[in-house]
Amino acid sequence: MPNSGGEAPEMTVPAPIAMLAELTHRCPLACPYCSNPLALHGKARELDTQTWARAFDEAAALGVLQLHLSGGEPASRPDLVELTRAAHEAGLYTNLITSGIGLTPARLDALEAVGLDHIQLSLQGTTPDLADRIGGYKGGFARKMAVAAEIKARGIPLTLNAVMHRHNLDDLERTIELAIELGARRLEVACVQFHGWATRNRAALLPSRAQTEAAKRIVAEAEARLRGTLAFDFVPPDYYADYPKACMGGWGSAGLNIAPDGTVLPCHAAETIPHLSFDRFPDKTLREIWYEGAAFNAYRGTDHLPETCRSCDRVNIDFGGCRCQALALAGDPAATDPVCSRSPDHHKVTALLEAALAGGDGAEFTYRRMPRKG
C-alpha cells in the first residue's frame, strides 16, 4: 500500500525488478493489435543515447535486474548497439524485443559483442501470406525467418512471441513446431489484449470460446511433451477468464516503463487514465519517481479497491485486476476489473463478447501506421 506513516518509502515499497525501455514508437509493421498509445511520440521527442544510458545506470542502482529494450521497433534506433552496451555495462540482463526488421547479420554480431543477453522475436503467423497480412508489411515473414536463422546460428537465447487471435489461433500447433525449428527456448502464446490500438480491432481479432479452449488444451499437451526443450507462457484472452490477471504483478510493485520521451509509467497503458500526472526522466530521478511519484502511488496496494475486492480471498492474488481495463470497461480505474466474474460490471464484458463475435467474421483490420512527421 502507499506509505501513509512515518517510514521511508524504501521500507514499505519493494524495489522494481524489471524495466521496459520503449526506445521509440517508430515501427515498420502495422499490426492491428498494437498496444502502444493512440498518440505516438515521433523521433524528435525520443530520449538521446546519453539520457537512456543514465536511465539504465539509475535503474540498476534502484534494484532493476532485467531490462527489456522495446518500441515500436528498437532496431529503428541507429544507436541500438550503443544502448545495449550501456545496459550491459550497467549490469542489467538485457532482452531485445523486436520484429527482426532492421537486424542485419553485422548488427547481430555487434549486439552480441557488446553483451546482449536475449532476443524476443515477434511472430504474426506461420506462413508468408498470413504473417504479412497481419503485420501489414510485405516480405516481413521472409525477413523475420532469415533473422531467426542468424540468431540461432549465433546461439543467442531466443523467445518467440506469438500474439494469437481469431485469424491465427487455429494455427497454434504449427506455431509450436516453428518455435522448435527456429531454436527458441521459450514460446509466448499471448492472446491479444485489448488496449491501445487493439481496441479498434476487437471485432476482427477476438477469438471464439471454442478456439480459446482448444488453445489451452494444445498448450497443456505441448508443455508436457516438450518439457526441457521448449518452455511456454500462455496468456489467454481476458474476456473468457473467470478472474483477472495480476496485471504487472500489482500496480507499482515489480516493474516500470519509460516511454520514448522519458515519461515514466507504472504500466504500458497507464496514460489512458486521464487524471494521473506522470513524471518524466531525467526531470526527476527514477528513485524519486518509483517511491514518491503520485502516479505510482495512486493504485499501489489494495486500499483503493472496492469492498468486492477487499473482502475477496483473491485480493492478494490478482489485486483486483487491471486498472486500465477497469477504466475502459467500468469507467473507474479503482473499480474491480470487469473481467472478474464477481464484478458488478461483468455484464459489460459479456455484452462486448457478444457484439464482437456477432460482427467479427467480416470485420476488416484497421492497421496501425505512424504519421511520417516526428
Curated annotation (Swiss-Prot):
Pathway: Cofactor biosynthesis; pyrroloquinoline quinone biosynthesis. Keywords: 4Fe-4S, Iron, Iron-sulfur, Metal-binding, Oxidoreductase, PQQ biosynthesis, S-adenosyl-L-methionine. GO terms for molecular function: 4 iron, 4 sulfur cluster binding; cyclase activity; iron ion binding; oxidoreductase activity; S-adenosyl-L-methionine binding. Residues 13-230 form the Radical SAM core domain. Binds 1 [4Fe-4S] cluster. The cluster is coordinated with 3 cysteines and an exchangeable S-adenosyl-L-methionine. PROSITE patterns: RADICAL_SAM. The keyword Ribosomal protein does not apply. One of its GO terms (biological process) is pyrroloquinoline quinone biosynthetic process. [4Fe-4S] cluster binds at C27, C31, C34. InterPro entries: 4Fe4S-binding_SPASM_dom, Aldolase_TIM, Elp3/MiaA/NifB-like_rSAM, PQQ_synth_PqqE_bac, PqqE-like, Radical_SAM_PqqE_MftC-like, rSAM. It comes from the Bacteria. It is an enzyme of class 1 (oxidoreductase). It catalyses: [PQQ precursor protein] + S-adenosyl-L-methionine = E-Y cross-linked-[PQQ precursor protein] + 5'-deoxyadenosine + L-methionine + H(+). Its cofactor is [4Fe-4S] cluster. Its EC number is 1.21.98.4. Interacts with PqqD. The interaction is necessary for activity of PqqE. Catalyzes the cross-linking of a glutamate residue and a tyrosine residue in the PqqA protein as part of the biosynthesis of pyrroloquinoline quinone (PQQ). This is PqqA peptide cyclase. It comes from Ruegeria pomeroyi (strain ATCC 700808 / DSM 15171 / DSS-3). The gene is pqqE.
